[in-house]
Amino acid sequence: MRIAIYGLGYVGLTGAICLASEGHEVVGVDVSEDKVRRIMAGSSPIKEPGLDKMLADALAKGRLRCTIDAADPVRSVEISIVCVGTPSAPDGAHNMRDIAEVTRQIASAAHSIGRKDKLTVVYRSTIRPGTIDGLILPILASSLGDAAGVIDVVYNPEFLRESTAVKDFFHPPKIVVGTHDGKPSAPVEEMNRNLDAPVFTVGYREAEFTKFVDNSFHALKVAYANEVGRMCVTLGIDVKVVHKIFISDTKLNISPYYLRPGGPFGGSCLPKDVRALQHISNDIGANTHVIDALMRSNDAHKHFLYSRAVQGLPPGAKVLMLGLAFKSDTDDLRESPNIDLARKLIQGGYALSIYDPSLKAEHLIGQNLGYAFSHLPKLPDMLVSKEVAENESFDVVIDANGAARELSLKSANVLDFHAL
């Protein structure tokens, strides 16, 4: 394929050289004359294992050339890949100046030459969700008018790590392709055909957000690990032993579990132990800001779900909650976030009914009994049978524990809080 790469930094240059090594004809575009000159002389401006040899090979075989002229490749290439930087602005947002400028340059060149063949423009820079719809497509429409359809925009984020970028290019953890209709892009499929990785073809906004989710989670893991490390060092605990034990658990710790957006955490263990760990941290002055934020974040999610539940709902409306325990298939109500939600609904003046197949008020004992009735004194009166849950009309049904899938509900307005 004939491919242009805009922006020859770590991502762009690595991509250009790797694509050239696969036999594609690649044109690299960058605003820096010095960078272009160095690359064409066979000297990589970035330090990346294996890249110098691959660059020399690509130049020797005539598969890579570089230019400062953004319009140069537009006449002949099938794909243009945008890898320009999106540095932080003073307010923390991404500075989109270079994204906008490259988009204008590509569109202007396509307009000037009267390009008729479809050009796929692939964005790999990290961009805020909504950027393609709110910035890129309007620029194309303004520059090309009725001919804007000649350019097909795709978002295909990169997952390269500096120092292992070449390996990561050929062995990505996944391939994410964002298109206007969530359907595959044939040119991008052809470009990626040698890559063996799970492929997710989605809409623009989902693809745009993926990179933020990934990078923030990586940062979260590093910050959490370092907080644990600080506590271990201060307490005289061997952090390497703790780390080894932690990562050995691939069923829960290093796994997909607890990563599905849904209900807040609760129950008799997590809230109690998080608070206790916060207390230990405060005692020893470990400054564990990530751990300290856990309960606040959980409370914020509880508020979010309540606000979502009552949006547009008048006081007195009939509400059915499916599930009251902190998770399904248990009757443990201790620190259940669903208890908090039920209490707020009652305080808000809503007519609340609750169906939980695992819960019988007369069977509650001990702390479970005390917690339930201290928060919901009229709990027995609110519990309804499966028949009532299925056959009575409710203004809204809140599925807190995933019970809706086992019921034939008459009410159609069901909010899934078990899995957002």
Regions found by a protein language model. Give the residues of each.
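Structural/interface elements that position substrates and couple domains in central-metabolism enzymes
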Residues: 1-420
